[in-house]
Structure formats: structure tokens, C-alpha cells
Amino acid sequence: MGGAVSAGEDNDELIDNLKEAQYIRSELVEQAFRAIDRADYYLEEFKENAYKDLAWKHGNIHLSAPCIYSEVMEALDLQPGLSFLNLGSGTGYLSSMVGLILGPFGVNHGVELHSDVTEYAKQKLDFFIRTSDSFDKFDFCEPSFVTGNCLEISPDCSQYDRVYCGAGVQKEHEEYMKSLLKVGGILVMPLEEKLTKITRTGPSAWETKKILAVSFAPLIQPCQSESGKSRLVQLPPLAVRSLQDLARIAIRGTIKKVIHQEAVNKNGNGLKNTPRFKRRRVRRRRLETIVFLDKEVFASRISNPSDDNSSGDLEEERREEEATTPPDAKPEPPVNFLREKVLSLPLPDPLKYYLLYYREK
């Protein structure tokens, strides 16, 4: 699946393309996509394909196409403090983006069939927490991953506000998936080759909406153990945060408010995102394929005055861009204001590092 939008040269350009094509429609979803670089979840030798709107699979590792994840994130209608269950959590890319929206008082659980992929997801999560500035820009709900078949979840597990299944669900398993959902909750899953959004409006009442046609690998059926019994999957416990952890969250939140107020007093409008210098895009001739009598005829579509506001306008646009953008212009490296503020506080170093989650940068 995928290929609905043009490839980007970096993560931001990919997101720009998804916005332009209306796959990303809300600010919260856009912020989450920009905060986590899709390439970080690829193996090193395959990163050149990270910004294409294509699914990627290597062994048991799998990522859906960006346009699919965009539709899923929008359909889930995520809000801070909700509980989320990701069935087939894979690399943890989607779970981490969801965690940026859920905030510190949400619940973020994932079930993955393959133990090697669960380990891969934990490594990627650790890398994100240790190295990404986005961790300090958001209040993060850290995902917890367990290994097992998502069709064997223990029947006494808690229900969730939001559930996503990343594998094709057959009609026979629809009721099972619905049973994982709280009243008022939303379930998004590929059901009979349609990405489907199901909202639980009452104990036995549901609203169903078909979003788009998709092609997902089907759920793998459970295998019985040697004893003939299924292996029940125990989801992570719904643990209450310690007082110490709650204090850290509160202190970090207060510091962020101070930073924002200082920026308002200085600039009048708070912190601004670092400007992104976009590469100038070359206007390429688009190719249209016409299928006629089983033969493909390729017609070159060349820009003309009626198509492209005349070549004179393009030349003027080019000159203006060159005049306003220095040839060696590069965006300034982002500043982690929270980290700088914490390190400047008159506190013992161990407390500073605790407030920073012992992050490397």
C-alpha cells in the first residue's frame, strides 16, 4: 500500500506532501509526525527509502505507508489522557507518535507477535528517549510492548479508549476486536480490505465508517501449545505513577510555562519553530499514462501558460527565491530550551539529570 503522495527529501517534506494531499488534517497529528523521524525506524541500509509513501518490510520488521499511518492517526481522534492499545505494534513508530499526543497520564500498550520485533521496538524507543529533542518538547506517554498473539489476549484485561490493529481482520474476529473497546471508544482496523473506524456508542451500540480500501497481511491465527491450551497474552498493568515521577512531570511543566512566558515577554508571541529552509523544487514534466487497446501510450505533459501561469512568472519566482535565500543558507541547529533551563538551575547535578530523564542531549 502507499504511493499516494510524492516522496520527500526529508521527514518534513514528506509531512508537507501528506498535508497537501489531505492525509494529515489536524495540527496534533502533524506535530506528532514531524516530531519523530520515520527514518529512525528503518535499518541503516534501507533509510534511503524512508521518505517514500510506501510500506517497508524486512524479515519480521514492517512499517505501513505514511499515508496509511496518517489516516489511522486522524481516525483515532487522539486526546491527552486516553488509553491506547496497538495490536501488531511492530517497530513502535506509530505507538511513539501516539504517545506524544496522549501525554504523561495516558496509557500506551502494544502487542507484537514476533519477539525480535518487540526487542527492535524497545531499542528504537530507548534511542528516541535518549537522543530526540522532541522528547523534551512534548509530555510523552511511553509505550509498553509485550510479545504474543493479539487474538489471545487474556479475557480479564482492561478495555481501552482507542484500539488499532495493524493486520487484516476477518469478519469472524470483528466481535473479539470490539470487546477490547470501552463505551465511547474508537477502533480502527483493516476489516475485509477496508480501513474501518468503529465507534462504540453504547454497551451494544456501534457506528461503523469505511475510510479507504487497503491491503494488509491477515492476522496470524493462534497456535496451541503442547498441552493443547492457548497461550494467553497478559497486557502490561495499568500502573499508577509514583509521587516522585509526578513531581518530575509537574516541575518540567512549570519550567516549560516559564520558558514560554519569557519568550512572550521577549518576542511578543512565544517560541517559534526553527525556520525550515526548503529545497527549491524543480518543476518536472508530469507523465500521463493512457491505456488504449492493451498498449500504453506515454504523453509528456509540458507546462504552458494555461497550465502554469506562464514561463515568465516561473522565471520571476526563481529570481525572487535566489535573491532572498543565501546560497549557503542552512537552518540554525534547534535549541533545547528546557534542557538549557534545567541545567542552569541552582540544583544538585543528580536532581538536574533526573529532571532530564538522564538523557544524553
UniProtKB/Swiss-Prot annotation:
As for family, the record states: Belongs to the methyltransferase superfamily. L-isoaspartyl/D-aspartyl protein methyltransferase family.
> What gene is it encoded by?
PCMTD2
Q: Which InterPro entries match?
A: PCMT, SAM-dependent_MTases_sf
Give the Gene Ontology MF terms in alphabetical order. protein-L-isoaspartate (D-aspartate) O-methyltransferase activity
Where are the residues of the annotated region Disordered? Answer: 303-335
Q: What is known of its domains?
A: At its N-terminus, contains L-isoaspartate and S-adenosylmethionine (AdoMet) binding motifs. Also contains an extended SOCS box motif, where the Cul-box is separated from the BC-box by ~90 residues, within its C-terminus.
Write out the entry's keywords from A to Z: Cytoplasm, Lipoprotein, Myristate
Know the name of this protein? Protein-L-isoaspartate O-methyltransferase domain-containing protein 2
Quick one: where's region AdoMet binding motif?
85-94, 160-164, 181-191
* Annotated segments matching region BC-box: 240-250
Q: What does this protein do?
A: May act as a substrate recognition component of an ECS (Elongin BC-CUL5-SOCS-box protein) E3 ubiquitin ligase complex which mediates the ubiquitination and subsequent proteasomal degradation of target proteins. May bind to the methyltransferase cofactor S-adenosylmethionine (AdoMet) via the N-terminal AdoMet binding motif, but probably does not display methyltransferase activity.
Keyword Cytoplasm appears in the UniProt entry: yes
Lipid modification (N-myristoyl glycine) maps to 2
Q: Which residues form the active site?
A: 64
Compartments, as annotated in UniProt: Cytoplasm
Q: Where would you say this protein principally sits, based on its record?
A: cytoplasm
Any Gene Ontology biological process = protein modification process
Q: Which GO terms describe its cellular component?
A: cytoplasm
